[in-house]
Curated annotation (Swiss-Prot):
It is found in: Nucleus. Probable transcription factor that regulates neuronal differention, including synapse assembly of the cholinergic motor neuron M4. Activates expression of growth factor, neuropeptide and transcription factor genes, such as TGF-beta dbl-1, FMRFamide-like flp-5 and transcription repressor zag-1, in the M4 neuron. Required for pharynx peristalsis. GO terms for cellular component: chromatin; nucleus. GO terms for biological process: cell differentiation; nervous system development; positive regulation of transcription by RNA polymerase II; regulation of neuron differentiation; regulation of synapse organization; regulation of transcription by RNA polymerase II; regulation of transcription elongation by RNA polymerase II. Pfam families: Homeodomain. It comes from the Eukaryota. Residues 72-84 have a biased composition (Polar residues). CDD domains: homeodomain. Residues 72-94 are annotated as: Disordered. Disruption phenotype: Reduced pharynx pumping rate and abnormal isthmus peristalses in L1 stage larvae. Feeding defects, characterized by a stuffed pharynx, as a result of ingested E.coli packing the lumen of the corpus and anterior isthmus in L4 stage larvae. Defects in pharyngeal g1 gland cell morphology. Reduced expression of TGF-beta, dbl-1, in the cholinergic motor neuron M4, but normal expression of other markers of differentiation, such as serotonin receptor ser-7b and the vesicular acetylcholine transporter unc-17. This is Homeobox protein ceh-28. Belongs to the NK-2 homeobox family. Keywords: DNA-binding, Homeobox, Neurogenesis, Nucleus.
Length: 201
């Protein structure tokens, strides 16, 4: 009996044990596409949740990106304003030239009352002075020849501007016929006699 029982039993070897199927390795060409596919599913879930929620406003993707950019811009206005000012200062050549001129500009010379009086007296006599006369006048007043030259240039410009303003004021005065009727024979009648009357007498 024992021999028959042993022969009827089957021995299972370890190699024949059924093992679960091993997961095949993911090919390298599909590894790079997995994150993008996951992102697609996440975006689909988010869009699906927006559609199912009636109280949540649906915002398009382009508008959402613009709103995110606007929120990041207004989150730090001081930094954006500072960067804009720096860009404007560096990109504007007029500002750079103005700064360089202000840095190169020499301090204004203050003349004393004695120097101004002497220069005014000389200007009444002659409006243009030669280089030698400028040197002599500068030595007498304790100035440089360049300072004397600039003073005369400014004084001539001031005199010319005053003459133009006076002419403009006279041109704006309205004509008064009563003033003209006070001189029926003209203003020249009070002056020298005409040549015709003198020849007749």
């Amino acid at each position: 009996m024992q021999s028959t029982q042993i022969s009827s039993t089957t021995v299972i070897l370890p190699s024949e044990v059924i093992q679960p199927p091993q997961q095949s390795a993911v090919p390298s060409e599909f590894k790079n596409t997995l994150p993008s596919r996951l992102n697609l599913f996440e975006g689909f879930d988010q869009s699906f949740s927006e559609l199912t929620n009636p109280y949540q406003p649906v915002i398009p993707l382009m508008q959402r990106e613009s709103l995110l950019g606007a929120s990041s811009y207004y989150s730090s206005p001081s930094q954006n304003q500072r960067s804009y000012q720096n860009h404007r200062q560096h990109s504007n050549p007029d500002t750079i030239n103005l700064r360089s001129q202000q840095q190169k500009r020499k301090p204004r010379v203050l003349f004393t009352q004695h120097q101004v009086n002497e220069l005014e007296e000389r200007f009444k006599k002659q409006r243009y002075v030669t280089a030698t006369e400028r040197e002599e006048l500068a030595q007498c007043l304790g100035l440089t020849a360049t300072q004397v030259k600039i003073w005369f240039q400014n004084r001539r410009y001031k005199c010319k501007r005053l003459a133009q303003d006076r002419t403009l004021q006279l041109s704006q005065i309205p004509f008064n016929p009563m003033f003209a009727s006070a001189f029926p024979f003209g203003i020249n009648s009070f002056g020298t006699a005409p040549s015709s009357s003198s020849s007749g007498s």
